[in-house]
């Protein structure tokens, strides 16, 4: 048996091969993160005359192309949390020496100590979903930032506007700002303008509100200098562009999810976007022995400390993916809203005196057990089997 440790970096990767006894078969060597380097690695792997096990750290997008290359050439591999490798290194030596050659050696040695669980064959879909869901999150953050900028500008141009709409930027509010770009134009809106607003608001924008808004615009204390109006239009255009890109990304996510069709979608309250994040961040559910391991992977388990007679439990450890924790907590809330069994469980925890977020974290634990069962056994959700 040969154990291959690969240390991932941006422009090159380092690799070492050892045998069962830890003896070095191929000393640490580097190969570039391109087709030439990958072929160099393939030649090395093909030359080995026994079964091989490959281990590498989970280091974001730098290793994605290498993983796809290994999968396409029928080489299995196992990914490790960098924190586990770091702790393993510290357990072996007190010296603070670090290099890529040492790292790949430590990965190979750590690979020898654990049960080998190769990365799933659904790598392409998993990586695609992870990239799309994280990109969607980035777009939404950028889009939200434009609304903050818009608020700052409106505080100068038309400070009465946002409070008139309840402090929110509704579809109607954004339509008015995009089509009537100054308080003066808003104050001069006519009956045709109102007809358009009624269509946009689906009949919710009344004539009384229309008259009030025009009056506010007429008497505003805002500063309507050209440069401020120009800034506002640019921000509105950016928001519109980002909004359309979010829609495009969500469509791509839906296409990918429809190909996989995960059983967790049968749980009331779990939508496509949340299911996509959960599936992308967890990857292969079969690599977890139980739902408790999934909870630990997500960083949602409480910290625990015991020494002598002292024993304490603390807050969530919050290791792992913040995207995953956010998605699970959001799912827990919607499942409570749509599924009576989970609603009763949440109410029970609240009746025990637990705060909202703590009670919701208990719902997450219960939900994860359900998701784990559905995904590993390929079952549809049935509330009769949930206790």
Task: Indicate residue ranges for each PLM-predicted region.
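A detector of single, family-specific signature residues
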Residues: 1-387
